[in-house]
Amino acid sequence: MSMERQLKEQFAENREIVEALLGDGSDADSEYVIEHHFSSTNFDKLEKAAVDAFKLGFEVNDAEEMELEDGSEIFCFDAIANHKLDVALLDKACEQLMQVAHKQKVDYDGWGTYFIGDEIEEDDEEEQA
């Protein structure tokens, strides 16, 4: 699949995820931890991608080794950013990181975050009581 098509699909997915989170009541004004996922069977290539992501201003966690269902091993890390659920920011980050993945020949596996809403605040209030 071409990079242009991958970007187009990722941008559409970004909008769907943001709309779903906000539609479910996640707080639009909160700052979110956005974790962009990378993976590769080649640790050296993955390490180069991590360095590139760091140079772009992302926090990068240590690579982890995981065993897949078929018994093969894969390495993965997250490039982390903190910002609002803003589609323009997500699109820009995804484009930058997908270019890194393409350059280093590793997989960009999308991004994830956590719901921020009333139940988190209620849990905090219960802990303080």
Swiss-Prot record:
The family assignment reads: Belongs to the RraB family.
User: What binding partners and quaternary form does the record give?
Assistant: Interacts with the C-terminal region of Rne.
Q: What does this protein do?
A: Globally modulates RNA abundance by binding to RNase E (Rne) and regulating its endonucleolytic activity. Can modulate Rne action in a substrate-dependent manner by altering the composition of the degradosome.
Quote the InterPro entries the UniProt record gives.
RraB (IPR016716), RraB-like_sf (IPR036701), RraB_dom (IPR009671)
| Matches recorded under Pfam families | RraB
* Top-level division of the source organism's lineage: Bacteria
Write down the HAMAP family for this protein, in alphabetical order. Answer: RraB
Query: What is any one of the record's Gene Ontology cellular component terms?
Result: cytoplasm
The record's keywords, sorted A to Z, are: Cytoplasm
SUPFAM superfamilies assigned to the protein according to its UniProt record, in alphabetical order? Hypothetical protein VC0424
GO molecular function list: endoribonuclease inhibitor activity; enzyme binding
This one is known as Regulator of ribonuclease activity B
Q: Where in the cell is it found?
A: Cytoplasm
The main location class comes to cytoplasm
